[in-house]
Amino acid sequence: DYISCRIMNLFVETFFNNAMITELFLVMRASGVDTFDILVYLHEHTELYTPAIKEIIDRFILMTKEDLYDSRKEAENVLNNPDIVQKHLDNELGINELLACKADLYLIFDDINHLIFRAAKDILVTNNKLTVSSEMFLGQLCLFIGCRKKDFYKYEDEIEMDFDFDFKEIDINGYDIDLDNIDEFKCQKKSLRFHHTSFQQKIIKSMINININTPV
């Protein structure tokens, strides 16, 4: 089913490409759970979607269907119409629904972050691998990823948060951590400060100014 494949493509773009949630996927892989299995679980369990996520996916499906033609002949007629082609070139027609909806999903980062972690934990429960310690760690990893990657465009903001796991050491290990051994990384509460350097702020500000009116 074409629409089903397109939805999976949206999930791959949103959660996997550009390393958006890579820390979770690395931990899960080290614990015997494949990344694709998590994405398939998301695809199959639509009941987990928040209203905001469901609205974006429904819009993505609608836009995808609008791009389809009833016949090859109809598609050829459109392609052979110079006026329609020119309107696409002038951005008067057409939209990259994949990029548009990926951006919309990023803007509700808390929703998608909690969704992917919910899927991961459900799989661990099914495999009888979710312990008190691993559940606690995944909860804090979810917060950690949110602090690092949510609202990047608020480049002057600073966030400080306490954690019960040594995320600096975990990061050094490349998140190649089997959840069965997660207690080894427990520590006294450590406070981490998340912020952009002045150089990073300059780059982000420049990219926002360049792309603010760019059509998707």
PLM regions: where:
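A structural motif corresponding to the C-terminal lobe/cap of the Radical SAM core domain
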Residues: 1-38, 180
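Generic structural hydrophobic/aromatic packing signal, biased to beta-strands
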Residues: 2-5, 9, 24, 38-42, ...
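Hydrophobic, Leu/Ile/Phe/Ala-enriched alpha-helical segments that form helix-helix packing faces
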Residues: 9-12, 60, 64, 116-127
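Residue-level signal for secondary-structure boundary elements
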Residues: 13, 17-20, 36, 50-54, ...
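Short, surface-exposed, charge-dense and proline/glycine-enriched linear segments
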Residues: 31-33, 47-61, 163-170, 187, ...
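Polybasic, proline/glycine-rich intrinsically disordered low-complexity segments
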Residues: 40-79
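Charge-dense, extended regions
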Residues: 72-216
